[in-house]
Amino acid sequence: MAAATADDEGSAATILKQAIAGDRSLVEAAEAISQQTLLRLACEVRQVGDRQPRFTATSIARVDVAPGCRLRFVLDGSPEDAYVTSEDYFKRCCGQSSYRGFAVAVLTANEDHVHSLAVPPLVLLHRFSLFNPRDLLDFELACLLMYLENCPRSHATPSTFAKVLAWLGVAGRRTSPFERVRCLFLRSCHWVLNTLMFMVYVKPFDDEFVLPHWYMARYLLANNPPPVLSALFCATPTSSSFRLPGPPPRSDCVAYNPAGIMGSCWASEEVRAPLVYWWLSETPKRQTSSLFYQFC
């Protein structure tokens, strides 16, 4: 087998090839590939009866870490200094009959193409899962991921990054390796946080957690690039074989922040329509916890 280059030796495909060739143990390969997996497109889901659902990625306008490493939020539409504690927001959500939890999509790092995904609509349908947090920390992680994905440039400051990293450190120390879903959310937050830092020209805390296509995009899309370069990071027409199995539903029920740096793929109809189609389908919604085998 040809040796992997420095640029691709950490990719999931390369790791799998090494395992097949016997250059890595299966356990090591599985662990390495799992590090390339993250959750994206986090959004809250609300629905009253059989009415049109509402998918909201903008519920949290700002995140802050208060003394004692306690998370607090400014909710969308509230004054900038009107903070609510994460505990209060958790109770508020759980008390709403319309609240369904969070929708999230599973991707690998190489599938995130900045303004698009390397996952066609028909496949993306099967990447979504429903997350119903029962613990405050799990709820906080989902909220933080959703906020980081929609964080505008004006909020992306070194002080915010430092506070978020400190909070993630505390959350990580409270998390057992056997709490696989929580570990996945933690890893996803680190991927998005470090990539966001890179995109606003702040040195990331960990360069290994900068999404590869975003790394290229910052350099290639600067200074009015030619269309051929811009097209590398934008959605292209999907083959009819990989389109949704039925008419695409209306996607105006998906709320996202157009100014959110890490959520630019939300603008693509090929991302929003599969989310709505998945939710409206009659098939049971897969729970995020079912992504992992339980050994007990």
From Swiss-Prot:
Signal peptide: none annotated. It is found in: Virion; Virion tegument; Host cytoplasm; Host Golgi apparatus. Disulfide bonds: none annotated. Pfam families: Herpes_UL7. One of its GO terms (cellular component) is viral tegument. InterPro entries: Herpes_UL7. Its main location: virion. The keyword 4Fe-4S does not apply. Keywords: Host cytoplasm, Host Golgi apparatus, Virion, Virion tegument. It comes from the Viruses. Plays a critical role in cytoplasmic virus egress. Participates in the final step of tegumentation and envelope acquisition within the host cytoplasm. Interacts with UL51; this interaction allows incorporation of UL7 within the virion. Belongs to the herpesviridae cytoplasmic envelopment protein 1 family. This is Cytoplasmic envelopment protein 1. It comes from Human herpesvirus 1 (strain 17) (HHV-1). The gene is UL7.
